[in-house]
From Swiss-Prot:
The gene is mnmG. FAD binds at G21, G22, G23, H24, A25, G26. This is tRNA uridine 5-carboxymethylaminomethyl modification enzyme MnmG. GO terms for molecular function: flavin adenine dinucleotide binding. The keyword tRNA processing applies. NAD(+) binds at residues 282-296. It comes from the Bacteria. Keywords: Cytoplasm, FAD, Flavoprotein, NAD, tRNA processing. InterPro entries: FAD/NAD-bd_sf, GIDA_C_N, MnmG, MnmG-rel, MnmG-rel_CS, MnmG_C, MnmG_C_subdom, MnmG_C_subdom_sf.
Amino acid sequence: MLKVGRDNVDFLDHYDVIVVGGGHAGCEAALAAARLGCNTLMLTLNLDKIAWQPCNPAVGGPAKSQLVHEIDALGGEMGKVTDRTYLQKRVLNRSRGPAVWALRAQTDKREYARVMRSVVENQPNLSIREGTVTDLVLGRNDEVVGVVTHFGSVFGCGAVILTTGTFLGGRIWIGRHWQPAGRAGEFAVEGLTDTLRQLGFETGRLKTGTPARVDRRSVDFSVMERQPGDPDLRWFSFDPEVWVPREQMDCYLTRTTPETHRIIRENLHETPVYGGWVEAKGPRYCPSIEDKIVRFADKESHQIFIEPEGRDLPELYIQGFSTGMPEKIQIQMLRSLPGLERCVMLRPAYAVEYDYLPATQLYPTLMTKKVQGLFCAGQINGTTGYEEAAAQGLIAGINAARLVQGKPLVTLPRESSYIGTLIDDLCTKELREPYRMLTSRSEYRLILRADNADQRLTPLGREWGLIDDRRWALFQAKQARIAAEIERLETQRVKAHDPAGIHLSQLTGQGIKGSATLAELLRRNPIHYADLLELGLGNEELDPFEQEAAEIAVKYSGYIQRQQAQIEQVSKQYHRPLPPDLDYHSIPTLSKESREKLAAVRPLTVGQAARIGGVNPADINALLIYLEVRQRQKTAAAAPVGA
């Protein structure tokens, strides 16, 4: 680690913001900083692998799709690129309520990377350069002032964003064999973890993995279940300019067999985890196939999805089949699956372990607490998934830009968005396994829907400087149309004896007393907006997404209002700031565990304190009472004598 004044270093060049890494977090961070007017440099190991999808070439899914919609609503890029490069789209959980609807897209991995790289390369204020960052340069006040590459080049800056993915101390494993790598064919980064430890950061190890790729020409799809895309297309981006319908490709479903399970059980000792060579925790919600066989021993079979990696590629991704087995055993496992009996493996599956920084060492702005100007985003913070990484990268990029411009840093409260929930969880909870976003992690799912992400966040994106005039005009016009339609639905009435009234009564099995508004009828099951259109009572000038937004707002208005009231009630207490100099060890009414946890995390608000593992409601009440007593004592001490 270099610790010097700015004037004592021979900088090769100087930038406002330097982003270390060119993955999904790095791209969003670099684009955000550059679009906010900062001279930005992205330093990445391999220019040909910008925005690469090293595991599943897919975007979205439960909770993850909400993240992508929110990224787009704030002015990010992931949703646009996905809409331009998808191979297939499906809405998951469609039979359930709108709070958990999830758009998922299979993407063309090479096209996705090519399009995102083009966006990055053509972004004003943004330079990209190939290089491996191995050290940081600190100023006299321990603020970050630059980075050092493997070959000794030094670049100065006002802020650094680390988006290192799985490359920090990365090792990939196939059976008993390993090599230093962040992913297959790419070098690991050594040295940077040592610097972070010297600065006093706690580090740990996590594990993930990716399945084998097989040649589609060697697969028999006729014995598998076809999984086509949805005929009615949906979009991640709220910008109609990127809505281009494309021919969709099929995915397929097969299943593990008793033979698959036998091969795995007999060879568990050959895997890095069960063999005892890797102790790092893997993702709970995306386990290896051997973990599934061990943890769910009573299950006779597991679903395996066969997914294309590209429109012009022979490679198929074997989803749900990641493993660390030796290659010879991997082939046996693959050929035990129906339809893959003669498959040719093009790339073996592997496990990868890497260094990370527990994110309790960050503020919710994603700047580290120990080093001014140093931000972290993506897998370095303990998350798993492209969408989680991109969301963090966007917020880190916004705040790095604001820091160098002398503006106050911004945060998203957990009740505002899935992004806010994600970051709050990371900065508050002690996570010892890769974190994946789930709808169950949000207390406010009905309000944090995919369809209203623009309504919730685009005004913030505009305020922060990432939503241009064209997007803002589109947003305002759309919201005006939806508001007008909701008002029409709440006021237009249908009489009981009208043909439409009779039809709707028969549909619901409930009569109409005199007359009813369209909104009242929409709240009855199973009436939907499509029924109103069929009867000539809908607004055909609205696009289907605007019609749906109006329907959801009306149909769930009571639930939404109750949840909004709950948020407002909780916010009054939970948004109360905690003094930065608060000595938790001196509060005797707190439990010992709570004192230790609060002192370690140093939460910014009462709400953040309440979400720390090991801090119970009684401790929060004790903390609130202590703050009240302290405030009264301060007020009394400040009062004039004799007053």
